[in-house]
Amino acid sequence: PKKNKIKKEDLKNLKIIDVLKKVLSHPNVCSKEWIWQQYDHTVMGDTIQKPGGDSGVVRVHGTDKAVAASVDSSAVYCWAHPLTGGKQVVCESFRNLISVGAKPVAITNCLNFGSPENEENMGEFVECVQGIGEAAEYLKFPVVSGNVSFYNQTKDEGIKPTPSIGGVGLIKDYNKMITMDFKEIDNIVLVIGKTEGHIDQS
């Protein structure tokens, strides 16, 4: 992908508060609450993990079990590197499910790409599918269904390669479900693993 080059003179009058506001208001960063609040997630009283976290959770009637669901997409990662982006979106779905205490069971996908008649678009598609397959096999997270949508473009320009993954997981006892909110003052936040090198497509 093309990279925007920043010149030193462009930074002279830059104010950090303006940069922060711009970043926090970007659709990829800002709150998505206005979207999911439009649906009444309390219908039938089955929702036990409200929207806003990494996965939604609904109870299974007559049991202590619950089903967790997550939908993830990775256009920016796939645009930068389709193989890695395909792996990343499967891993994100997996992480979002285990973050609420669910055992990931299976995924479905919706693969959105430009025209397959364009060699670059077709190459992105092939690599992305390969990445999804490799990650799913490694994680034992089977792809049970899927859909491909080609020719998503304006004139001759295709959209960024956009795989969307819907994942489901099982929680055997929803009383042990994990929620994202802090439980008390001075809770500790831990970062596991190395974090360097992720800013480019974050």
Language-model region placement:
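Glycine/proline-enriched, intrinsically flexible loops and inter-domain linkers
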Residues: P1-S202
